[in-house]
Amino acid sequence: MDRAAKNGLESSAKEIPALNRDVFPGPVSAAMMEELGRYVIADLYPFVVDLARCEGMWLGTVDGRRIFDWAGYYASKLIGHNHPGLYEPEYVQRLVRAANNKTPNPDFLTAECLEYYRTIHRIAPRCMRNPKLEVYTVNSGAEAVENMMKYLINLFHLRRGGKSASAQPGRFLYFQQAFHGRTIFALNVTETLDPVATKDFHGFIPGNLQVPFPGVNTSESPEKNRSRTREVLETVDWLLTRFAGEVAGIIVEPIQGAGGHRVAEPEFFQDLSRLAHKHQVFLGFDEVQTAGGPTGEIFMVDQLDLPYPPQAVATAKKFGVGVIYMLHPMEDKGVLDSTWGGGLVDMVRFVQEMKIVEREGLVAVARTKGERLAAGLRGLAERHPELVFNVRGQGLYQGFSLTNSALRLRLEEVALQEEALLLMGAGVDSIRLRPNLSTMDGDIDLLLELLERCLRRL
C-alpha cells in the first residue's frame, strides 16, 4: 500500500535528520549553479534537485542530500514526489506520447486534451456550476489572470453597449500587497513589496483603484479585525459609487500568498460579493495558488459562502497549466486565444494526479490535517511569544509571522542550513507553508519538531 493511503499515520521521513553541518550548496550543486550563471542571471535555491532521489515531501539533491520541502515549488506541487501512481505503465505511455508530440490546444484536439477539459469542467467551483459554464486553458498563472481580466473587460464592454460604448475609461479595483502575475494587466493590479517586479510597469495602465486588504491578525481582538474589515468594505462601496460605470471588475485572492500569507474573514468576501452585485461590477478570484485542494476544497471560493457566484476564477500551478473559469461564455469569439493553450504533457499528468487525489481522498482530509498543523503552530506561538505570532490559514495552507523581518530571514536560513528544512517567506515578516496533498500526520509532527529546534536557536 502506498504511504499516502495510510490515513496519514506516519511520516514519509525515514528518521528525523541530524543537524546538517554541511551547509548548502554541496560541491556538485555549486558547480552546476556556477555553470548556469554563465547563461542567465537567476536567484536560485542553494541546491540542485535530483528528481530520481525525491520522495513524498522530500527533495533529493545531486549531492545526495535530502531536504524536507514545505514550499511545494511555490505551491505548485499537487501530490508527493514520485508517487507510485505516476509510474503505472499505461499512464507513462500516454505521458511519453504527449511529451513527444506537443500540440496546439484545443485547436488540434486530441483525446488527451479533451480528457483534461472534461476533468477541469467536472471539478469546477461548485458556486459557478451552470449549463453555460465555460473553461479555457493557457500556459501559466499570469496568463490565466491576464485572460480573466480580458474576459471581464469584454463583459464590461458589452454591458456598456459594445461597439456603441462610450469612451469613458475602464478600471479595475484590487488590493494592497496583491500578487497576480508578471504580465502587463496582472502587474497593474499587483503591489509587490519588492519593487523590482513592478517599478517600470505599475501604472502603465492608469486608473486602477487600490484598497487595503483586511488581513486578519489572530493576535488581535475579533472586534479589531471586524472593524478593519468594515473600513475596507466602506472604502470599496465609496469607490464603486464614486466611479460608477467605470469599474470593469474586482480582482482578489482568497489568501494573499506573496503579499504576506494574508487571510481575510469570510464575511469580507461575502460582503464584497454583495457590493459587486449592488454596483453591477464583475468579480474575479485569483486562485492560482489556493486551488487544488489544500484548503479543504478544490476551490477555496467554495468555502466562502458567497451570496452571488463570481463571474470568473483563474487558477494554474497545481493544475499544470493556466485555467480560466467563466460563469457564462464570451459572446465575442477569438478574444482569448493562444498557440499552445497549455502544455499537453502537463494536462496528461494533472488528470492522473487528480485521479490519485480522488482515489485517496486527499482533499477531504486536508481540513483535519490542517487543524493538526494549525494547532501545532499555535503551540509554537504560545511557547515562543517573543518570536512567533498571528498563526492563520485555511486547511494545510497555514502561516505565521515573526516579530521582525530579520528573524524571518534568519529562521529560513537556520531551517535549511541546520535542519534541511525548506520554508518559504511571505511579505515582510511571515512564513507560508505550502505542502503537497500527500502530506501525512507524521510529516506535520516532524515539521513542528524541526521548527521548535530552529526557534530555540534564534
Kindly give the residue locations of the regions a language model identified:
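Conserved N-terminal phosphate-binding loop of PLP-dependent enzymes in the Aspartate aminotransferase
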Residues: 2-458
